[in-house]
Structures are given as structure tokens and as C-alpha cells.
Amino acid sequence: MVERPLLCREAVFDRQNQLSGHLFRLLQSSPLADSQGNSQPAIDRQLLHILGASPAAWNSQTAFLPLSSASLNDEAIGRLPAEKLVLLIRLSLQDEHPPSLLECLSLLHQRGFGIGLFHQPWHPAFSRLCHLADFAVIDVGASQATDIHDFRALFSRLGCQFLALNIDSPDEQRLCQQSGIDFFHGRFAAGLPIRQRSSRDDPHKAQLLNLLQLIEGGAETPEIAEAMKQAPVLTFRVLRHLNSPALGLNHRIDSISQALIMLGHQRLSRWLAILLFSVEAAGFADWLLIESALTRGRLMEELGSQLKPKLPADPLFLTGIFSCLDRLLQRALPEIVDELPVSDDIRHALLVRRGPFAPLLAVAEASEMFDEADIEAATRAAGLNADQLNQALLAATAWASSITGHRE
């Protein structure tokens, strides 16, 4: 068994169908911060330690942390960045003294933390604390339709926002949306179809694939630049993407030829692969796919730098992001890979799960499934430990958020 707890981060969506942030918890715990007995403070302590140890900006989008009120005096909270961080507080049955809770939450508010309050009207302190809530939180999995409406009515006069957790189906999400809920968490998006058209119907995706074929096939710079002249709209999109703040380049790039000179073929392939995942009118499932691809690529790169620093970073990234192309393009992955002259290491990892990149791809894929046994097995097979995976996941999440925050 992996000796340390594993981190889990789950998508949170807004009313515009966009990915707005993440809920962070331990894989072995609940997003409701309701572990049995007195174990929740220990779980909270482990979660706070993992997050506090990361130098990555994992809260560049809103980060939601479910915690017990019994953990609010933990010094580790003070070491976390307060900006865009919302503490989702479950009132402990052992914590029934309203004045002390009121003082504690007020201090956290003053320090810049957002406060979310689980819907616990039976708790003695609940009514005294409602006015401090920036977010009102409800467990949809344990609620009826009337409960959701009543919950919305109770908090509406306080001017807070509404977060629904554990939404399992599209029907439940629609009910929450109709009830005025602002943010949505749960597995409902995983079963929805993506909205993208296939590459055969999307000229920009077809042009991007053609450009990737040229670059990965070793075409010379003039040939690649000439191909781009045939697609002026795509050239504009590529250059706008390369000059976006998310990429952090030191010099402005004004032409594809300049991009090839400044970035090199491999680095340009990387950013073209990212651009493949641009989506118009993206829905919940599209955003999950975009984040999955970006996080897989960056996670493999982060883990590779720890485990196999001699392995080149860009091919690891491309392996991760290309592993999602079948869902993006709605075609069989072997068919797509056959059209891209990628290296044997990438090809073998994608198609037969062999070669030096395969173990890290297995870790990246397992980390999305929330199955503890599968993640532990993949992590062990790759020669990694839980701390390495946790920190790499936070770094990958921070990077992917910086990209999705600058989507077209």
C-alpha cells in the first residue's frame, strides 16, 4: 500500500457550463467532511499538510476545501493562500458553542478566506453563523427536490452563492440549475456527450492535425510556414494563443517562422496540441475533456522530471495530451496515431502501453478515476510515492488552470 494519503481534486462548474474551480479532498475521504467518529480532524490535517507543502498556484481558480469546524484552529490553515480559497465548513457535533465559532469564522473572513457553510439547520450554531457564509452548500445526493428549493429559499436573503455537491446525473444538475444553484460538483458531467464535431467536419482541427503531421514528420521551416499561409484564420489563432499571458513567453511572436525559430519544432508541437482542444460553446463534458488532456500531459511531464529527469519533457507531455484525442476527434486512437508521425515511445505508450512513457501514462489515467487500488498499483509500478504524485497533481492542476483561464 502507498504509505501516504492520496490527493483527489474534482471539477466544479458554474451556470455558464464552464469549469470554475476544483474541490480538493483526500481520495479516502468524503467531499462532505463527514467521516465517522472523530477521524475528520485528522483527515483535515493531512489535507492541509499536502496543500501547504505545494509551491504551485493550485488556487488560481477557485479552490474549495471541505473541513470540519473542529479543524478551524489548525495553524496549517494560516499557511495556505487565502485568495480564491473557500473553506467548506461542516459544523461538528462536538462544536456547539456559537460565540467561539463566530469569532473563528470572522477572523478567517478578515484574512481573505471564503466561507462555505453546509446546510445543517439542526445544529445549535447554524442559525448564528449563516450571515458569514459566502457559499451555502447542499449535498444533492441526500436531498429531495423540495429540499433543494427550501435550501435556496433559506439562504437567498443572505446574498450568498450556492454550491451543490454530489450531483450524480444530468437531470439532478438541471434541477439544481432551475432552482438557482450557482456551482455544481459531482459525476453528472462524466456521462454527458462532448459537443465537438469530428476533425473531418472541423476545418481548423483538420488543419492543426496537418500542421502537427508536418512538424512531427521533420518538415523544414519554410514548408511549415507555407502550409500555414493556406490557413490564415488558423495562423491568427495560433499566434494569439502563443502570445497569450498563460504561456508566459518573453518575446512577442509575429509569425510561424519566428515561432519555429524561438520555440523549436517540439515546443511548437506542444502548443498546437493544446490548441487542438479549443472548443466553441463548450459544455460540461467538453471542459472535463479539456482539463483531462491538459492535466494528463502536464502530470506526466512533472512526474517525469522527478522520476526520469533524462527523459525529454515535451514527448511526455504529448503522450498525455494525445491519449485523449480519440474522445476529442471521435475516432479510433490507432487511426489518429497512424496519421501522426510520432516517436515510437509515444506510439507504444498510446497503443500497446509499453515503453518508457507507459508507466507514467498509466498513473495519469488512474489519477482521474478516483479508484484508490488502481492509483496505488500504477504509482507503485512507476516507482513513485504518494507525496510525489500529490505534488505533481497540484502543479499540473495549477498549470492546466492557467491555460483554461485564457481560453478563446
Range-by-range predicted roles:
Residues 68, 76, 81, 90-92, ...:
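Short, solvent-exposed coil/turn linker segments
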Residues 79-190, 312-315:
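The catalytic core of metal-dependent phosphodiesterases that act on cyclic dinucleotides
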Residues 35-39, 57-61, 107-111, 155-156, ...:
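N-terminal start-of-chain detector that recognizes signal peptides
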Residues 26, 43-45, 83-86, 106-109, ...:
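Short, low-complexity, polar/charged sequence segments that are solvent-exposed and flexible
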Residues 1-86, 91-96, 107, 260-267, ...:
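Bacterial c-di-GMP phosphodiesterase EAL domain
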Residues 20-22, 34-40, 78-80, 100-102, ...:
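Surface-exposed beta-strand edges and their flanking turn/coil or helix-capping segments
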